[in-house]
């Protein structure tokens, strides 16, 4: 398995399995001289960790992070930063019924056909449990971006199943377990999830992520375009089946006279492009949306096959999120931050001294 590293100059390599002794990552390329403590990282991990409400998996993991290297006397040294998170609440017996069968919608079948072996306990390496190290690495990236460039990366849930969540204010996001930017709709979301859980079923979600303060110039055309790398990173999150940058698929129905964001001396008029033109950041907010499929692990009996190719009926009895999208917001934020810090360093390496006579215009003319 050779696809475990994200990034070019700021790289993150994750390791571990859902029911192994520990999970973690190695961050390479972090600039030296930034203050960093375990508390800085823990604050982000606590936003993602399981067991925080009745609407998510009841697996109780503290997700306490340990910094093993790369930090001396509270400051990054420029050497690899190793983060370790120990697994403490594995319950592998819940997966005894799928040792010889494949769960529909999961990576069981494809991992088996590719590698000839699979860790059936909670999905092993393919588990969303492995997003915890991504959030840990994302905390490092967020801190550097904020302190060096004033970049803020924020996310929220914009839809749960067929329920749209209208945006009200960012302050609402941290006040509810759904990361909803609208406190008034939370009771409806809770009732929806309670009914879903009783049915033994699951549902998908849409998450919006915004990076503000990104300067013009980040991105490496043509194959490492900023939006291309964002899309790749987002699609690397478990259960993500779609990514939009800016207007996304709505662009299909928009005329060029509407979609093309005009430029004025006072700034851009609109941001249909999502803060990226030609694969390079414009200086506007970078806006991303992801579509997350329904959780495949449900209690409803479903048809499948055994390793021998025979018909089978599969029921999943482990502790699972009825909607993985509920905890996806900090994961999506982290992925965006990791792409941005990588491109910030790449831009600095080649074009950090480039200056033009054209003034940098505001992200919005209003």
Swiss-Prot record:
Under InterPro entries, the record lists: Chorismate_synth, Chorismate_synth_AroC_sf, Chorismate_synthase_CS
User: Cofactor note from UniProt?
Assistant: Reduced FMN (FMNH(2)).
Tell me which cofactor or cofactors this protein depends on: FMNH2
Gene Ontology cellular-component annotations? cytosol
Enzyme class comes to lyase
What's the catalysed reaction?
A: 5-O-(1-carboxyvinyl)-3-phosphoshikimate = chorismate + phosphate
Which EC numbers characterise this protein's activity in its record?
4.2.3.5
Q: In which pathway does it act?
A: Metabolic intermediate biosynthesis; chorismate biosynthesis; chorismate from D-erythrose 4-phosphate and phosphoenolpyruvate: step 7/7
Q: What are the BP-aspect GO terms?
A: amino acid biosynthetic process; aromatic amino acid family biosynthetic process; chorismate biosynthetic process
Cite the binding residues for FMN. Answer: 125-127, 238-239, 278, 293-297, 319
- One of the Pfam families matching this protein, by short name: Chorismate_synt
GO MF annotations for this entry? chorismate synthase activity; FMN binding
Amino-acid positions noted as binding NADP(+) in the UniProt annotation, renumbered to this chain: 48, 54
What's in the keyword line of the UniProt record? Amino-acid biosynthesis, Aromatic amino acid biosynthesis, FAD, Flavoprotein, FMN, Lyase, NADP
Complex formation = Homotetramer.
NCBIfam families this protein is in? aroC, PRK05382.1
Which family does the record claim for this protein? Answer: Belongs to the chorismate synthase family.
Q: What does this protein do?
A: This reaction introduces a second double bond into the aromatic ring system.
Q: What is this protein called?
A: Chorismate synthase
Q: Cite the source lineage.
A: Bacteria, Pseudomonadati, Pseudomonadota, Betaproteobacteria, Burkholderiales
């Amino acid at each position: 398995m050779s696809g475990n590293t994200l990034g070019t100059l700021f790289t993150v390599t994750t390791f571990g399995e859902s029911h192994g002794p520990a999970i973690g990552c190695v961050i390479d390329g972090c600039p030296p001289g930034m203050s960093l403590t375990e508390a800085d990282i823990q604050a982000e991990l606590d936003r993602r960790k399981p067991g925080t409400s009745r609407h998510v998996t009841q697996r109780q993991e503290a997700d306490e992070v340990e910094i093993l290297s790369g930090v001396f006397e509270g400051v990054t040294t420029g050497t690899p930063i190793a983060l370790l998170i120990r697994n403490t609440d594995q319950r592998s017996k819940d997966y005894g019924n799928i040792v010889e069968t494949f769960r529909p919608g999961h990576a069981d079948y494809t991992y088996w056909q590719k590698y000839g072996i699979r860790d059936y306990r909670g999905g092993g390496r393919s588990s969303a449990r492995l997003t915890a190290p991504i959030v840990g690495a994302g905390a490092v990236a967020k801190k550097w971006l904020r302190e060096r460039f004033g970049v803020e990366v924020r996310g929220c849930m914009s839809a749960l199943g067929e329920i749209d969540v209208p945006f009200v204010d960012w302050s609402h996001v941290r006040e509810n377990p759904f990361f909803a930017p609208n406190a008034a709709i939370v009771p409806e979301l809770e009732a929806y999830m309670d009914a879903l859980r009783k049915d033994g079923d699951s549902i998908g979600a849409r998450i919006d992520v915004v990076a503000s303060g990104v300067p013009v110039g980040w991105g490496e055309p043509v194959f490492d375009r900023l939006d291309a790398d964002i899309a790749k990173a987002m699609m690397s999150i478990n259960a993500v089946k779609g990514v939009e940058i800016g207007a996304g698929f709505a662009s299909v129905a928009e005329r060029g006279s509407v979609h093309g964001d005009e430029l004025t001396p006072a700034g851009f008029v609109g941001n249909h492009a999502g803060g990226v033109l030609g694969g390079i950041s414009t200086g506007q907010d970078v806006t991303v949306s992801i579509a997350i499929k329904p959780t495949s692990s449900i209690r409803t009996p479903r048809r499948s096959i055994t390793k021998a190719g025979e018909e089978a009926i599969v029921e999943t009895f482990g502790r699972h999120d009825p909607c993985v999208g509920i905890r996806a917001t900090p994961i999506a934020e982290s992925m965006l931050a990791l792409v941005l810090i990588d491109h910030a360093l790449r831009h600095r390496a080649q074009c950090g001294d480039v200056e033009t006579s054209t003034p940098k215009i505001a992200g919005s003319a209003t």
